[in-house]
């Protein structure tokens, strides 16, 4: 077994016997009582998890922190009173690096932590690390990426095609959680702000590694109706828009704007237009970003004969933006939504 497989196996051994009570704590009192009860706080289960990892020959250490919901750990005056839980860092001797996990996780997705534990300042309690390496950023342990590739044809008033989606990081974990809840092969991954177009699909395939919960691949064939009004067809070249509403509706902002995590959304779409129609209108390419480039979006569209290709990238490089960036964020979000809703207009020749 590889190092990662051993860590996943240890997590599964824990979860087969014990369940999390929903409580986050910093200390554990009596492991024997926890085992007898069959459940415990994350701290109680984490101590048992560290013992199991030791049986697998893996060294592990606590990583103490203040949860996001209870406030950031002060940079200038870190205090023991501000600490309220810990998670586990398992050490890989071959790569001389750590992977992070917590017993509150539903799935053993290494380095993909519950959002309440995703903080940018946590303390690794390892005697073997120099002082400068004991502060850990738990938000940027891995990449959170959605890559979607769509190949479609417009014919007889319908859009038919094939969609492949590859998910990495938090998106992959959320997808797997939804699969567990539904327990059937009828799930389509959509982000909370995804477009709600109605479509039919078939041939759903989901590919995943039983030991790697940080990645997953989904593909299916789909069919949806194109809007037909007054002899014209109206088609969104994104086919599956990412955003449809602007959550930033306040006129001003006093507190920082906090996102769950940094992420990247990349859509590639190839669209074949129908015979007997010509393009009357087509969206323009567009690029926008914040002054510090922590948020940017590129919408690049090209037409070549009856083929339209679109590359759309939306990337958030940070989990937090300052209040003085709020107006800029509002404007960018509004413009990006306009592009998500932009249509190709086709008229008959």
Model-derived features with residue positions:
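A sensor for short, sequence-defined functional sites
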Residues: 1-349
